[in-house]
Swiss-Prot record:
Pfam families: Phos_pyr_kin
Binding site for ATP: 112, 144, 149, 183, 210-213
Superkingdom, taxonomy of origin: Bacteria
EC number: 2.7.1.35
Protein name as it appears in the record: Pyridoxal kinase PdxY
């Protein structure tokens, strides 16, 4: 069985960061070792309040050192990183990735470069973006930006269409990662009434589209974390790229539908777990080149 060291944020109530990736990945048949960069009461989009703290950067290193001390780091098949509470956390994660790859040269690094949202702008300090662009990108095997994050990683230019996004993703492939998953094309997609994703390698690219699920002004949080977790599991299990993209699009759609059906704000991962593994909907990915 595959093992993923997942270094992300954690919320006690709800599903974001590790709280959105840990259960789905286990339900999909892999072990997840959750290591939290922050621990909050709930995600920060609640207008009322949130409480909690950012974990000290040395805490992250100490935990991984403990795993190494019992001789288990070589069993780690992939490191997944998400929201960073500080730039120093990012630098520590880069060191952890190197340590894991030293213990297991076949291990992957899946970087979810959480910086912000196309509609909401950047939500992390510039120094965090700097660590992601300068340190995490070059050592990643797979990177999964949304549109804003793709623009930032590729140099800051605004991307207006799918062709430009493919070219920007290819630019990232030249800097380190073998695979770029653009989790949400947003305004650069073919259609604004659909949710669109890209999967890009140095030689090929695929596009998939699914219906948007209307939640009004209050969109669920954690969709990107769920997407990254599912994609990593599929790839670790040897699923072909096109098939993995199709499964992830359908699985996330099933979760969104169940969340809408139950009139909830938080992703209903437990209620949708069977459909997440075996989606009833199917969205065919188109190869662009």
């Amino acid at each position: 069985m595959k093992n993923i060291l997942s270094i992300q944020s954690h919320v006690v109530f709800g599903h974001a960061g590790n709280s959105x990736a840990e259960f789905p990945x286990r339900r999909m048949g892999v072990n997840v070792w959750p290591l939290n960069t922050v621990q909050f009461s709930n995600h920060t989009q609640y207008p009322e309040k949130w409480t909690g703290c950012v974990m000290x950067a040395e805490h992250i290193t100490e935990i991984v050192d403990g795993i190494a001390a019992i001789g288990k780091l070589a069993q780690c098949d992939a490191v997944l990183s998400g929201y960073l509470g500080s730039a120093e956390q990012g630098r520590r994660i880069v060191d952890i990735v190197k340590k894991v790859k030293q213990a297991n040269p076949n291990a992957w690094y899946f970087c979810d470069p959480v910086m912000g949202h196309p509609e909401k702008g950047c939500i992390v300090p510039p120094e965090v973006s700097g660590v992601l662009c300068e340190d995490a990108l070059p050592i990643s095997d797979i990177i999964a930006p949304n549109l804003l994050e793709l623009e930032t990683l590729a140099g800051g230019a605004t991307l207006h269409n799918v062709d430009q996004c493919v070219k920007a993703a290819r630019q990232l492939c030249q800097q380190g990662p073998k695979i770029v998953l653009v989790k949400h094309l947003s305004r650069a997609g073919f259609r604004h009434d659909r949710f669109e994703m890209l999967l890009v390698t140095a030689d090929h690219s695929w596009h998939v589209s699914r219906p948007l699920v209307d939640f009004g002004e209050r969109q669920p949080v954690g969709v990107g974390d769920l997407t990254s977790g599912l994609m990593l599991v599929d790839l670790l299990k040897g699923v072909e790229l096109k098939t993995a993209l199709e499964h992830v699009a359908a699985a996330v759609y099933e979760v969104m539908l169940k969340t809408k059906e139950m009139n909830e704000y938080e992703l209903q991962l437990v209620a949708a777990q069977d459909q997440m593994v075996h989606p009833t909907h199917n969205f065919c990915a188109t190869q662009l080149d």
